[in-house]
Every structure is written in C-alpha cells, then in structure tokens.
C-alpha cells in the first residue's frame, strides 16, 4: 500500500467526480446495505481459486468474477474495510505476478480492466494501472472505419463490457479519450438495438427481452452517464435512451419489487441478477439528478427490499439465471435453471449496495 499517494489521489479524484446525492436510509437493519454488502464481501473471500474462461476463442479471468471483485473493491472502500481492500489487492496482484493470461481480444476479456483500475485507485500500485490501461487501450488499437472498437459485436452485454471499462479508465486517468470512446460506442448500440418499448432483444431475430441481458445495458448506461460531460455530442442520445429504458422498467417491475427472467412476460419467474442491475441503474440516475420523479426512487427502493429477501445468511444471492445463449424459443428462457451464489448475481448486488451508501 502507498498511503501518501492514496490520500492525495483520493482527494483529487473525489474533487473531480460528478456530484451525487446521498441516499436516506429506507431499510431495516437486516436489509441495510452495510450488513448485506459485508456478507457478500465475506462470501467472496471464501472462493480461493480464480474462475477462468478458456473458450470462445479467448482466455481471461471470468468477467463475472471481475465484476464481483470490482463490487467488493467499491464496497470495501465505502465501508472503510482496509483489510478487505488489502486482501483483494494481494489476490489480484497474483494475476500480474503469476502471469495469468488475458488475451485482451474480446469484450469479456478486456472488461477485467475495471478491477485493476479500481485497485489502483485504492492502493496506488502502478502495476494495476499499467494492466488496466493496456486493456482499455488495446480495445481501440485498430478501430473500425466508423471509429468503433474492433471488438464491437452489437450484443447487448457489450454496453456494460465496453462502456464500464472506458468509463472507469476516464474516471481514474481523467483522459477524455476514454469517455469519448464510451459515448461513441454506446450511442451506436442504442441507435441499433433499442426497441420502441425501451427494452432490448437478446439478439438479432430473438424477440425476447432477457432480464440479465437488459441488466447489462441498464448498468452500462448508468455508468457512462455518471461521468459523461453534458457537452459531449452523444450525451442527449444516451440520456434519451437511458430514460426510455428506465420508464419501461418502472412499467414492468412486478408488484413485489422484483423483475422477471423475461422482463415483459408476466409468467416468467423472478430473477435476481437483473433485479440488482436494474435497481442499481435506476438508483444511479436518481443520485446524479437525472431521474427526478419520485416514481424512480420508489422503484429502486422496492427493488432493494425485494432483492434482499433472496440472499442467504452466508451472503449468497439465490435465483440467479445461469449463463444463457440466444435461442428463438420462449420456453428456453422460461425454463432456464436457477443457481445460488453465482458471480452474475453477487456482482450487481454489491454494486447496488455500494451505490446506496456512496
């Protein structure tokens, strides 16, 4: 750790961030984000081994683990849990020192960079910054003729995978090239993929609004808007797409506060990872003064109070949809297995808890 660097850097970063509003507590003690967040941190550190993807033509620490560790870092920071920060830094420094591979040629590999950016912010260890900047920069090493990343797939997941990495790079380095990349990319995805009802199909010719797929979009839009300067030429389009999606989510939230495996299908089961992502995305909009109507506050509050009923005493989120490919068959989505403790559910629950406290 480098405490002198940490204190100076923290003051600089805090002073330069967009202003956000504190959330007034609306929860009981057992549902408090402090209690829930610490449970999820404790659970995270029971998992010793790295979860590695070595398929689909690339190799990297699994994006879901990276997103969960990113959530642990933010949560530990807001709780002032220095032991957890050090433990996290020690664990993921091994990715560098032990040369755990990252082929850095796919959005699911490069998004790992959000974690070392956050660890650099918390510790001042430049090895994390070097690793993170490489993953952000190589994403635009050979851009397409339209300026988009050569990793562009127009899969809805990418709104988070690309948007969060480039936004985090801007947040930490303050180099505007990163947020300009994020804005260019995200407006192109919105223009091509957002449906008239504000939601997103899982894929071309797949007319189903899968919960977690839409969750990646919602969280990614919120992340970009939390840093995107209003004078950016793409700000109006991204803001419009975000608000359009948030209004759809208000409409489709179940009476109990959850969202469903298929967002707009009432017979679909209640799914936690999407609920956490949607709640986080809406909360961020309220905190940054984008969503001012009381209905948005009521919606994210209902989501948190419902979501926390799906967390075990040892900090595992239940009813998480397993990884899901694209299928033109509604029963495929309605019958997907549910698991407990998967990083896809742990990660956004940590983000949501952090945002309630930050």
Residue ranges and their predicted role:
Residues 156-157, 167-262, 268-279, 291-325, ...:
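Extended ligand-binding clefts on enzyme/binding-domain cores
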Residues 37, 41-45, 86-88, 131-145, ...:
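Acidic-glycine-rich active-site phosphate/pyrophosphate-binding loop
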Residues 49, 80, 97-101, 124, ...:
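Helix-capping and short linker residues that terminate individual alpha-solenoid repeat units
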Residues 59-65, 69-72, 105-120, 154-166, ...:
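Aromatic-lined, polymer-binding surfaces characteristic
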Residues 128-164:
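Asp-box/WD-like beta-propeller blade repeats and closely related beta-sheet repeat scaffolds
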Residues 50-57, 148-149, 201, 205:
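Active-site flanking loop/helix segments enriched in acidic
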Residues 1-24:
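Bacterial Sec-dependent N-terminal signal peptides
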Residues 25-66, 78-87, 91-94, 98-123, ...:
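CBM-like carbohydrate-recognition segments
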């Amino acid at each position: 750790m480098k405490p002198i660097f940490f204190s100076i850097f923290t003051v600089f970063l805090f002073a330069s961030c967009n202003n956000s509003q504190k959330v007034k507590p609306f929860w009981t003690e057992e549902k408090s984000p402090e209690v829930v967040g610490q449970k999820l941190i404790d659970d995270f550190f029971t998992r010793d081994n790295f979860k590695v993807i070595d398929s689909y033509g690339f190799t990297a620490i699994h994006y879901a683990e990276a997103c969960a560790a990113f959530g642990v870092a933010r949560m530990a920071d807001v709780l002032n849990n220095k032991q957890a920060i050090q433990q996290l830094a020690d664990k993921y420094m091994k990715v560098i020192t032990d040369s755990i591979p990252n082929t850095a040629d796919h959005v699911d590999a490069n998004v790992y960079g959000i974690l070392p950016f956050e660890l650099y912010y918390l510790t001042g260890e430049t090895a994390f910054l070097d690793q993170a900047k490489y993953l952000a920069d190589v994403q635009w090493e050979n851009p397409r003729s339209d300026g988009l990343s050569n990793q562009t797939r127009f899969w809805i997941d990418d709104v988070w995978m690309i948007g969060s990495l480039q936004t985090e790079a801007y947040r930490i380095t303050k180099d505007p090239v990163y947020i300009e990349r994020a804005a260019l990319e995200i407006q192109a995805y919105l223009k091509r993929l957002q449906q008239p009802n504000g939601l997103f199909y899982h894929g071309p010719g797949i007319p189903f609004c899968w919960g977690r797929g839409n969750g990646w979009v919602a969280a990614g839009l919120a992340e970009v808007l939390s840093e995107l300067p209003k004078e950016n030429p793409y700000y109006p389009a991204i803001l419009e797409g975000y608000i359009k999606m948030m209004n759809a989510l208000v409409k489709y939230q179940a009476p109990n506060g959850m969202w469903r495996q298929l967002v707009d299908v009432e017979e679909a089961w209640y799914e936690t990872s999407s609920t956490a992502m949607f709640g986080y995305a809406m909360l961020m909009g309220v905190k940054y003064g984008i969503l001012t109507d009381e209905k948005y506050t009521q919606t994210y509050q209902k989501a948190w109070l419902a979501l926390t009923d799906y967390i075990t005493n040892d900090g595992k989120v239940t009813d998480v949809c397993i990884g899901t490919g694209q299928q033109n068959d509604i029963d495929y989505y309605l019958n997907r297995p549910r698991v407990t403790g998967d990083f896809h559910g742990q990660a956004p629950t940590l983000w949501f808890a952090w945002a309630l406290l930050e």
